[in-house]
């Protein structure tokens, strides 16, 4: 089966949806929308639709474009996924697709502990029980929203109150149903091929001719056709589901189709929000399907891994990533997982590294980076999209450089008591730049990192052998807050007051402390020299605040 890109946009795309969409019956779209239209009409006009009006609505819904039907079905599947407990979502996919023997699939209960109700994206005050929705979607049985008492659970079901496994749900048939099934006269009974035409004995006797009035607008042939037809039938070849790399649960699905999902489609900036009555009354207690409108969560990781808790800095590596962006332009708008061998020498990040949503913007520096980069290769991993801060690599000598801060941030810097990176890598990182080869006599400031004290700088580093007392480094922090996606990393001014007293009691008499706000963007260091306490600044660094490292109160700022 193929799917239109209108149906499965980047917001609607999900392996959970792609696996289940071929099993949704075509009657589901027409049936749910028809019932919602009838309900809205009754609320507005305080009377029921006439047969002609209802038939016109039915014909309109049946003739709707397949792409529209699939888009609706994909959004409804996404909503159902939220209502299924996380640990049962995989079993649900495998059992519906026929790859596993049916087992119980429990849903998240409502506030009273009962099965939840949803409005099936029609924004009408008509809600459906989840088990009813499952039967209509995957079995094509035209049940009413009030037919919940007609449903019975299989004897093998261990939790009948919350189970939404379609194979465990049956429809009870009473005597009246059997009687009507035998005697009801269809409008097309006179046409060849109809049940009544083929078997005259099924025609009701004279005393029953006026006993039955057909209130629906579907005939038998229509119901059978739409209940047996998948909702994906009749669409063009534009969107794949056949290949889901590294997804062992779907590797044999549609094995005859060899397709590859395009990664070059532009990410949507905003997902249309669905306002539903049941969401207003009872929001789902679980996470969202698209982890947010622009969720860092959806696209490149497997559907069951996105539900894992990512609060720990140590993340579990999947068996194989679904895909990796081949270029900065092809990067997915969601988080991509890279194997560990892509970044050797970074023990602080166990098993995986998260790439950010978009490649970093070009540097606004008016001079080329080669002017301040050393020709020798650095020890950290170089990637056009991912930047690894040098503090993640204890062997990287660039950790000795002092990063700068973002002057546009209004927050006050606070010390980091642990002296280590906190949690995840939240945004883009630019490597700390080494001193220019033209200033070979300049030496970087040495940082002493401890677990109990703020990061301190020893004054002995300024008077080391071979280093002039006047040689200093300056940290560049751009005025433009969008420079390299600046995060909340800041460096406070020196922890001395004007009387020369240390602000932190833990600081010794020969140390000067700096503090961190939070991990974020790393700024560059440019060597400069001080003559008679006057900094000799580079000529090509306008629009940057210069914080001199080495003397407490000697600061300079270049003018525009």
UniProtKB/Swiss-Prot annotation:
Biased composition (Polar residues): 324-339
Record flagged with keyword Nucleus: yes
Placement of sequence motif 9aaTAD: 396-404
Region named Disordered: 257-369, 384-445
Amino acid composition bias (Low complexity), ranges on this chain: 407-420
Cell compartment(s), UniProt: Nucleus
GO MF term list: DNA binding; DNA-binding transcription factor activity, RNA polymerase II-specific; RNA polymerase II cis-regulatory region sequence-specific DNA binding
PROSITE patterns: CTF_NFI_1, CTF_NFI_2
Gene Ontology CC terms, in alphabetical order: cerebellar mossy fiber; nucleus
Alphabetized PANTHER family for the sequence: NUCLEAR FACTOR 1 B-TYPE, NUCLEAR FACTOR I
Domain description: The 9aaTAD motif is a transactivation domain present in a large number of yeast and animal transcription factors.
Subunit structure: Binds DNA as a homodimer.
Family that this chain belongs to: Belongs to the CTF/NF-I family.
Name under which the protein is recorded: Nuclear factor 1 B-type
Organism of origin: Gallus gallus
Lineage of the organism: Eukaryota, Metazoa, Chordata, Craniata, Vertebrata
Gene name per UniProt: NFIB
